[in-house]
């Protein structure tokens, strides 16, 4: 008897389900179809064997990519090896994707089945999945599916920004539109300004130069010898500048008002700015083509190569086209008209704008266009699928087209393709090595800058952290200094007079010398951490009941006195003991005198 298990892939994890044991799987089809919508009936046929949830969204994305590519992920392998029976011949595993089924059968040895009753079971599992798995709600399952769908689509749409061909498509389309607009606007400026200065149209043929001159001259009656140098800069020809100056003096144009001149100058400036932008866009297109398709650019030119890519939709689509399609790309109307009327098909499309077909004789135009389309197809495939694109192959292919042209004209036999490609391979390897070396240098420089930046950030953070403890110490020292005076006020609050306090105060002022003050300051800084802790605890723990004890405490809390014989480097505890003993002697003398 065959045991049927079904593998279901969900955004939250893998689920392995088992069906009730029957001798023939086909007998399950009507029962499953009836019970798909009813959860109770579906539970009687299908039960959940194991569920393997994904640890994170990244793991879910990895598993989704593996399933789409037909690869058995480690999580799926662990689930199947753990929960499927060891006797593989008695197990039939149902899967929804034939690719993953073939991979499981090849790697793990389980018999896999798709379609038929498996599709109906998976439909029911998809409908009741949140009820089969404990702790899973319909809302959380939908959120997981939405998040995984966005991540999966983002990974599929992601592309390399350095070799994007969509920018080329938009640039060449905008360039063609700008050419039409600049031509139309220039003709409008010629017609508008021609009423005032009609002779300028015959002298200047270039549209951009004409608009610059119309903007500069303005009223022709104000043109004089002082502006001749500027005219030479604009026309880049001294004879034309002199002719413009002479024509302005004897022009047959009508006079024009100031407001009309302002409008003409404003429109001329717009046309000039459009022409300048057109030049910058053309430079941008050339740089992009050298990055994306260097071989195609070297072979047929940047403009024609960009039009081929734009017409095909992408560089990948152009690489997939055969040479016969590349030859007539852009001449679809003529092709279908010829097929409809059973006439001659076109010989060339967009590649007609290359210089090779124009240089060929009329009888050789078809032959050279076919040869050029063949080389364009090869160049586009090299650019599309090479890891480090270089222009070496495009230059060699261009040399071959030149040799073919000379062969048609003079009969000189060109070199063999095998020899040319061998030379190109050697040069391409050298160029690729040079490019990789430059990229490695740039990466090293970038890493050095990153390390310096991180080191500067770490240094700044360490300086900030080192400054904060000092501030905390300063804040903690201030209340400690205030607490030194508190024990002196205790005897006064209790109503007791201490003779040692009144007796010792004038002696302190007389007995301290400069050396003793210096030594006491040094000892206070050395023992600032240990002594204040003792002072802090004494007033809280003990109360003053005897004037003698109060005298002893007040004497011990006063500033420490050191004799000149004692060294400055003595410890803080010894200094405290000596000062307290001296104060005891003074206290006894005062009591005897009383």
From Swiss-Prot:
GO aspect biological process, one term: rRNA processing
Location relative to the cell: Nucleus, Nucleolus; Cytoplasm; Nucleus, Nucleoplasm
Disordered: annotated span: 458-594
Residues recorded with modification Phosphoserine: 314, 466-467, 511, 519-520, 537, 563, 569-570, 579, 581
Any one GO cellular component localisation term in the record: pre-snoRNP complex
Residue(s) carrying Phosphothreonine: 468
Keyword field contains Plastid: no
Function per UniProt: Involved in the early to middle stages of 60S ribosomal subunit biogenesis. Required for the biogenesis of box C/D snoRNAs such U3, U8 and U14 snoRNAs. Part of the small subunit (SSU) processome, first precursor of the small eukaryotic ribosomal subunit. During the assembly of the SSU processome in the nucleolus, many ribosome biogenesis factors, an RNA chaperone and ribosomal proteins associate with the nascent pre-rRNA and work in concert to generate RNA folding, modifications, rearrangements and cleavage as well as targeted degradation of pre-ribosomal RNA by the RNA exosome.
Name by which UniProt lists this protein: Nucleolar protein 56
Gene giving rise to this polypeptide: NOP56
């Amino acid at each position: 008897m065959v045991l049927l298990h079904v593998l279901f892939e969900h955004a939250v994890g893998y689920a392995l389900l088992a069906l009730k044991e029957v001798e023939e799987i086909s007998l399950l089809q009507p029962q499953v179809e009836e019970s798909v919508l009813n959860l109770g009936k579906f539970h009687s046929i299908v039960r959940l064997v194991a569920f393997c949830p994904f640890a994170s969204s990244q793991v879910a994305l990895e598993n989704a990519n593996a399933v789409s590519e037909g690869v058995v992920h480690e999580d799926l392998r662990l689930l199947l090896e753990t929960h499927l029976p060891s006797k593989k011949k008695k197990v039939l595993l149902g899967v929804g994707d034939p690719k993953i089924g073939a991979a499981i059968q090849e790697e793990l040895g389980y018999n896999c089945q798709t379609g038929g009753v498996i599709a109906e079971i998976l439909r029911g599992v998809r409908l009741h999945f949140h009820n089969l798995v404990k702790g899973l709600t319909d809302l959380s399952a939908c959120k997981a599916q939405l998040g995984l769908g966005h991540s999966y689509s983002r990974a599929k749409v992601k592309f390399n920004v350095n070799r994007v061909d969509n920018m080329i498509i938009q640039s060449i389309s905008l360039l063609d539109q700008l050419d039409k607009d600049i031509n139309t606007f220039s003709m409008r400026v010629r017609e508008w300004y021609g009423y005032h200065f009609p002779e300028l149209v015959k002298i200047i043929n270039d549209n951009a130069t004409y608009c610059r001159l119309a903007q500069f001259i303005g009223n022709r009656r104000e043109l004089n010898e002082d502006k001749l140098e500027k005219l030479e800069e604009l026309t880049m020809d001294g004879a034309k500048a002199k002719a413009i100056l002479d024509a302005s003096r004897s022009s047959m144009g009508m006079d024009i008002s100031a407001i009309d001149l302002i409008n003409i100058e404003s429109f001329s400036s717009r046309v000039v700015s459009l022409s300048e932008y057109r030049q910058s866009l053309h430079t941008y297109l050339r740089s992009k083509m050298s990055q994306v398709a260097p071989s195609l650019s070297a072979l047929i030119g940047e403009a024609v190569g960009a039009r081929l890519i734009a017409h095909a939709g992408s560089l990948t689509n152009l690489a997939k086209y055969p040479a016969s399609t590349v030859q007539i790309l852009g001449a679809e109307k003529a092709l279908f008209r010829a097929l409809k009327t059973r006439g001659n098909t076109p010989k060339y499309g967009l590649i007609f704008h290359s210089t090779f077909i124009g240089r060929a004789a009329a009888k050789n135009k078809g032959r050279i266009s076919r040869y050029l389309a063949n080389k364009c197809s090869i160049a586009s495939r090299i650019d599309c699928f090479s890891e480090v694109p270089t222009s070496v192959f495009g230059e060699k292919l261009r040399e071959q087209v030149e040799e073919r042209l000379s062969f048609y004209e003079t009969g000189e036999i060109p070199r063999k393709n095998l020899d040319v490609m061998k030379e190109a391979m050697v040069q391409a390897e050298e160029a690729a090595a040079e490019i990789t070396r430059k990229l490695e240098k740039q990466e090293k420089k970038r890493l050095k800058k990153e390390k310096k930046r991180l080191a500067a950030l770490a240094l700044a953070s360490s300086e900030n952290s080192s400054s904060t403890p000092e501030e905390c110490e300063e804040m903690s020292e201030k209340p400690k200094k205030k607490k030194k005076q508190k024990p002196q006020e205790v005897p006064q609050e209790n109503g007791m007079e201490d003779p040692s306090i009144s007796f010792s105060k004038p002696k302190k002022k007389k007995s301290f010398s400069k050396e003793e003050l210096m030594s006491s300051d040094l000892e206070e800084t050395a023992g600032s951490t240990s002594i204040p802790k003792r002072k802090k605890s004494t007033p809280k723990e003990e109360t003053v009941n005897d004037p003698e004890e109060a005298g002893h405490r007040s004497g011990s809390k006063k500033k420490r006195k050191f004799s000149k014989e004692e060294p400055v480097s003595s410890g803080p505890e010894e200094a405290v003991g000596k000062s307290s003993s001296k104060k005891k002697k003074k206290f006894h003398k005062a009591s005897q005198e009383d």
